[in-house]
């Protein structure tokens, strides 16, 4: 018998201004700034995408957060996974919307946390990021044991909240870049111990992973192997098992890289990226949504401890020229 899928939507809190973004991008900058300036790049390209139900909303408003929940419930979504940005030594960004959700008790809708553990730089939000030198806005750091404790205690109220999503009684916690944490085993031990000291059953840690990943220490031989479908299929097993061996309870799988390679050809895929990186060329990289979906998943995504990702649409052209065309809910 098949169980009903638990659909959780990632929640980006970028839709409200903060001083750091004001400093680097101008007063009032949010994710809407680039969305509103987007233009069609070819005939039939649907841009700009003007938000319908809620307009260009501001996440500081509780009314907006309530309406988001109504839309989510209508779509059959169980809860939100709020991205939070903990850079180490107590430094956070974009924390206000989630803090208000926890402190106010509203909306009454399930949630969990995802740690977006990556450095912020000027390359993140600019569609023309190849045209200027990258500047670090906030660096991701991992100070060690005391910071793990501070991180946990900062979110303890959320962890104790009855709305927090659990798996087998454990707190679901997603990590964006799981292999970037220098000693995840230590973090896991500390957090589970602190959880139990506070009457909680511990954590269910999920690491995000592409089922096909290009690494910095790639050899020419392994590049050639990636040119075959079979090698791409085998890649997922080793990627997922690597995270399990490092102590993660589950994997949130993503297949964008793999799907793009197979929808193009490996040679064309790498050539486009080479030209963009080396010669700063702004190439429109587009794929048919159906081709992406047909190549997005692997058999390992059916494992009990692997949680696949659903992408109903993808158009990153406000930031960079990458998009999927002709998406359909069918």
Which sequence ranges carry the predicted segments?
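N-terminal regions that are enriched for targeting/export leaders
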Residues: 2-61
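Conserved small/polar residues in nucleotide/adenosyl-binding loops
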Residues: 324-329
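Aromatic-lined glycan-binding groove of carbohydrate-active enzymes
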Residues: 8, 184, 190-323
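Substrate-binding cleft and catalytic face of glycoside hydrolase catalytic domains
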Residues: 105-136
């Amino acid at each position: 018998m098949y169980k009903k899928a638990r659909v959780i939507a990632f929640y980006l809190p970028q839709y409200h201004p903060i001083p750091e973004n004001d400093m680097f991008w101008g007063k009032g900058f949010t994710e809407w700034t680039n969305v509103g300036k987007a233009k069609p790049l070819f005939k039939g390209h649907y841009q700009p995408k003007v938000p319908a139900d809620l307009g260009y909303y501001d996440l500081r408003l509780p009314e907006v957060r309530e309406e988001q929940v109504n839309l989510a419930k209508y779509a059959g979504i169980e809860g939100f996974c709020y991205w939070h940005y903990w850079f180490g030594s107590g430094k956070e960004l974009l924390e206000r919307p989630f803090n208000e959700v926890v402190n106010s008790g509203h909306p009454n809708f399930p949630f969990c946390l995802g740690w977006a553990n990556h450095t912020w730089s000027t390359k993140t939000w600019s569609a023309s990021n190849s045209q200027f030198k990258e500047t670090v806005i906030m660096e991701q750091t991992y100070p060690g044991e005391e910071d793990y404790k501070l991180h946990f205690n900062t979110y303890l109220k959320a962890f104790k909240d009855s709305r927090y999503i659990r798996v087998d009684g454990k707190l679901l916690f997603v990590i964006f870049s799981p292999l970037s944490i220098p000693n995840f085993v230590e973090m896991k031990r500390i957090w589970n111990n602190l959880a139990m000291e506070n009457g909680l059953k511990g954590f269910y840690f999920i690491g995000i992973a592409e089922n096909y990943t290009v690494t910095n220490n790639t050899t020419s031989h392994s590049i050639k192997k990636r040119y075959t479908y079979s090698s791409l299929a085998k890649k997922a097993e080793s990627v997922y098992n690597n995270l399990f061996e490092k102590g993660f309870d589950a994997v949130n799988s993503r297949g964008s890289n793999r799907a793009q390679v197979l929808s193009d050809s490996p040679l064309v895929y790498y050539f486009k990226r080479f030209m963009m990186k080396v010669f700063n060329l702004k190439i429109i990289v587009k794929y048919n949504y159906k081709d992406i979906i047909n190549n997005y998943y692997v058999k390992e995504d059916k494992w009990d401890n692997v949680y696949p990702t659903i992408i109903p649409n993808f158009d990153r052209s406000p930031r960079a020229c990458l998009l999927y065309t002709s998406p359909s809910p069918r």
